[in-house]
Each structure stands twice: as structure tokens, then as C-alpha cells.
From Swiss-Prot:
HAMAP family membership: MobA
Localisation: Cytoplasm
Name under which the protein is recorded: Probable molybdenum cofactor guanylyltransferase
Broadest EC class assigned to this enzyme: transferase
An individual GO BP term: Mo-molybdopterin cofactor biosynthetic process
Catalytic activity annotation: Mo-molybdopterin + GTP + H(+) = Mo-molybdopterin guanine dinucleotide + diphosphate
Length: 200
């Protein structure tokens, strides 16, 4: 069993973006390829949770397993994706990553996983005053909490955090690198993110 594993969430419909965000161009590759390059440099095992519509093109791009949600919970948002990844890879801790934050650095995973300890269920960053539960790490024991929520048809990450002993991290090394956590949800944000990158 790995101590640490990674789960990339690429199951959303990307309705605001207008096309699958996982396949959007970024620095000569795609969002999903860039994120996986960063994650696999730090983590022993990584799995991509994909929407069925893009599973095949994603598989052609990446060298890690690409799976869909557990059938019974398909379409139940990020909780379904996270628990599907937890079932696929056995690990103590799971670093979660959405497919629409392409600016992430391998340094982030070193910081995040360095904050894990057995007394916590989750480690979650606070960026510009906002909790970021999809850029976080979760202990294996959280799996049962997720199943319980899904059985009650609850899908909220906030509801999950309310049931966990969470270590929130908001130190200078996180705040000074807020651009690591930028989510690209619209074409306007995509254009701005590319401009910001070219200005660095």
C-alpha cells in the first residue's frame, strides 16, 4: 500500500468553459498532462477520474489509469470521484486535484503532504480567505464518511469537511503562491491565465 496517492478529478461537464477543460491547451500540452506531470513527480500512484465522454482521449494522453465513477454513484460530483479513486488505489493519504488548476507546482504537494498526520482526517488550504477542499489531502478513513454522505444523497464537500478533523493551512508559503491554486472555469479566465503565465 502506498502512503500517498493522487486523485485527479476530470469528471465535470465543463459547461461554463464550453469544452472539456482536461483537454485544454497549456504550455505545449494540456491541462491534464501538465497536472499529471507535476503530481507523478511527487506521488507514487495517481489515478484520473474521468467523465465517460472524454475517457478515451484522456487515456491516449496520459500514462496513468483513467477510470469512471463507481457506477452506483456516477454523476454525484467530486465526492463520487474521490471515493472512486480511493477504491481504485489503496493508500494512507490521497492528494486531490481538479483538472482545471493547471498552474499547480510540485512544491504544493510537498507542502500539503508534509502537513499530514494521523490525528487529522484532512489537510485543506485556505487561499485568500477561502477553503479549498478540492486542492486538499484526505486520509483513507474519510472514505466511509463519503459513502455515508452519498447514501443520504448529500454531495457537498462542505458537508464532508464538517464531519472531519481538518487541519487548515494558510501560511506564508501558501499565500505567497496563490497562483498555484487558480481555477479556470471560463474562457475569459483561461485567456487571463495564459496572459499571466506569459508575463511571469
Amino acid at each position: 500500500m502506498s502512503k500517498y496517492a493522487g486523485i485527479v478529478l476530470a469528471g465535470g461537464m465543463s459547461s461554463r468553459f464550453g469544452e472539456p477543460k482536461a483537454l485544454a491547451s497549456w504550455q505545449g500540452s494540456t491541462f491534464i498532462e501538465h497536472i499529471l506531470k507535476v503530481m507523478t513527480s511527487t506521488l507514487q500512484e495517481v489515478v484520473v477520474i474521468s467523465h465517460s465522454d472524454i475517457k478515451e482521449p484522456v487515456e491516449k494522453l496520459v500514462q496513468v489509469p483513467v477510470i469512471e465513477d463507481i457506477p452506483h454513484y456516477k454523476g454525484n460530483g467530486p465526492l463520487a470521484g474521490i471515493v472512486s479513486g480511493m477504491e481504485y488505489i489503496e493508500a494512507d493519504w490521497y492528494a486531490i486535484m481538479p483538472c482545471d488548476a493547471p498552474n499547480v507546482s510540485h512544491e504544493w504537494f510537498t507542502i500539503l503532504l508534509g502537513q499530514t498526520s494521523n490525528e487529522y482526517d484532512a489537510v485543506v488550504p485556505i487561499i485568500n480567505g477561502r477553503k479549498q477542499p478540492l486542492l486538499a489531502a484526505y486520509h483513507n478513513r474519510v472514505k466511509e464518511k463519503i459513502y455515508a454522505l452519498l447514501q443520504e444523497e448529500k454531495r457537498s464537500m462542505v458537508q464532508l469537511l464538517s464531519q472531519c478533523n481538518v487541519k487548515y493551512i494558510a501560511g506564508e508559503d501558501v499565500q505567497a503562491n496563490a497562483d498555484w491554486f487558480i481555477n479556470v472555469n471560463t474562457k475569459e479566465e483561461y485567456v487571463q491565465a495564459q496572459k499571466d503565465l506569459s508575463n511571469e
